[in-house]
Amino acid sequence: APAVAAAAASVTEDTQITTSGTLPTPSDTDVHDTVSFLTQRGAPGTYGTFTLSADGSYTYALNNTSPTVQGLGVEETLTDTFTYTVSDGHGGTASNTLTLTINGTNDTPSVGPTFGFVTEDTLTVLNGALSTPTDPDTHDIPVFVAKTAETGLYGSLTLRADGTYTYTLNNSMNAVQGLGQGE
């Protein structure tokens, strides 16, 4: 009867989303039997697909668009497991598993646009709050980095760690004072 050992491999979200290799060489107590792997073409797993050739060479392709995969942070992992079978061609078979470790990476948080308006001579200070930030990494909590009086082209912005801000228009600038009605 044939025998075959278990195997392991890994992929990494966003960077190395496929892996290829060769499964352990099977053995058989019947020395005259030729043992081969039963092929699998695009076998679906929980997080990707597995393809296996009769010679034991395989490819795993991670579904990198999966929200669960994208939800992984640094040092977080998932596993996808596939069972493979070898045959001696005379009715004897043996099975084992390929365990794929999916490693997470740090995904960039994002925040949507925020709009506000100031008006020359009348509304020169604007207080507001930025849009709520999001992060695809499930366990990461994005925060704002406080900035004190960042000077822009026409005024200054103070951003607090809670996402609230104050924008102060430099109303004394010639460019600001030169604005016409509705500009």
Residue ranges and their predicted role:
Residues 1, 101-108:
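Extracellular interdomain linker/stem segments of modular secreted and single-pass surface proteins
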Residues 2-45, 94, 110-151:
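Extracellular ectodomain surface segments
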Residues 43-104, 149-183:
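Acidic, turn/loop-rich segments in luminal/extracellular domains of secretory-pathway
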